[in-house]
Amino acid sequence: MSSANIVPSNMGITKFLLLTISTSSVVAGVFALKPFFHINFGLHLLSHYQYWRILLWQFIYWNSTEVFQALFIIYQARDVERLLGSHRFASFCVYMFILGMFVTPIFSFLYSLLFKNLDYIQPGPTFLIFAILYQYYYIVPSTVFVRLFNIKFTDKFQMVIPMIGLAFSHFPSTFINAFLGWTMGMFYHLSLLPGTSWRLPIRFVKPALSPTHVFIRPPYSDMQNASTFNPETLFALPTGLDAERTENENQVENPVSNADANDSPTRQNARATAIASSSNTAASFRNRQQISHPPLGRTSSSSVLPTGPASQLYDMLSGRSERPELGNIREEDINTVQTIMQTSRAQAIQALSQTNDVQRAVELLLEQTADY
């Protein structure tokens, strides 16, 4: 069970309890340390004087069923920490842990003298868990009420089964431990125990409450200085492409003079006719735009093209870094190409970004249409 995801970040003590109970029980089972945590009165205390077991018996559970029930109860009672506050809740847990360390062995020893059916104390923080349970039932309000066969149930009814399972897992040892924990939790709430106003020093609570910062990527954004990003170091063009790129630029600047010499006269005449008609159409459209609408100023490339490091990468790949004039695309040029070719805005921008000339953009779109 990952407490980092299921418990809110402001409930650090609940997280600590979940991790401590589960981890200590698993470690004790893996390294075969379970025999060092229970208390046998006649063998450990009276014969071998192993009084150090009184300090350790609450740290682990013997089996996974008790671990699961304890974790379920602590998780469902997590609102106790939110209502009491993490500092007070941590002080309450330490107070009850120390109190249960001595109260349960004393009462269990007296019970064994009277009834002769209690040989050892079952290990586990059952005393602390039932003390927390009393606070949960008393201070946390119910939110769901269900009536079944004239019996009213609340959302706290889900705690009954793990409570019974944990209290009767090793009767009578666990039952005595649970009963004493519930009773001492009630006495603490009613301020019938000495030292209920004691608080744990805050320096011991801060480590459990300090937030954990996790970065899944470096904190970089486009709003920072774009000069720190150099796309040419990421994409180095082969040296053999320089001559080909220069030749392509010359063809873009002089589309008619650099036409293929092997074209037939009919194809060259058709090309010239298309260019002339597109120029006339563009000129007439500009005249209508100037009459009906005021002239539009040049818009920066940031309105239609990427910005920041992405813009630098786009400039290098598209050749705009070699020809800065391609970065200024006018809105009326986009509308002109769209009207002439009846194409989408993205296609018009793509054609203009290669030449920034309406005539050449129309020619490029015509060539693309002829290829299809």
UniProtKB/Swiss-Prot annotation:
Component of the DSC E3 ubiquitin ligase complex which is required for the sre1 transcriptional activator proteolytic cleavage to release the soluble transcription factor from the membrane in low oxygen or sterol conditions. The complex also plays an important role in the multivesicular body (MVB) pathway and functions in a post-endoplasmic reticulum pathway for protein degradation. Its main location: Golgi. This is DSC E3 ubiquitin ligase complex subunit 2. Residues 246-314 are annotated as: Disordered. Its EC number is 2.3.2.27. Component of the DSC E3 ubiquitin ligase complex composed of dsc1, dsc2, dsc3 and dsc4. Pathway: Protein modification; protein ubiquitination. The modification Phosphothreonine is found at T266. The modification Phosphoserine is found at S264. GO terms for biological process: protein ubiquitination; SREBP signaling pathway. The chain crosses the membrane at residues 26-46, 54-74, 95-115, 126-146, 160-180. It is a multi-pass membrane protein. Residues 249-268, 286-305 have a biased composition (Polar residues). It catalyses: S-ubiquitinyl-[E2 ubiquitin-conjugating enzyme]-L-cysteine + [acceptor protein]-L-lysine = [E2 ubiquitin-conjugating enzyme]-L-cysteine + N(6)-ubiquitinyl-[acceptor protein]-L-lysine. Residues 269-284 have a biased composition (Low complexity). It is found in: Golgi apparatus membrane. Keywords: Golgi apparatus, Membrane, Phosphoprotein, Transferase, Transmembrane, Transmembrane helix, Ubl conjugation pathway. GO terms for molecular function: transferase activity; ubiquitin binding; ubiquitin protein ligase binding. The keyword Secreted does not apply.
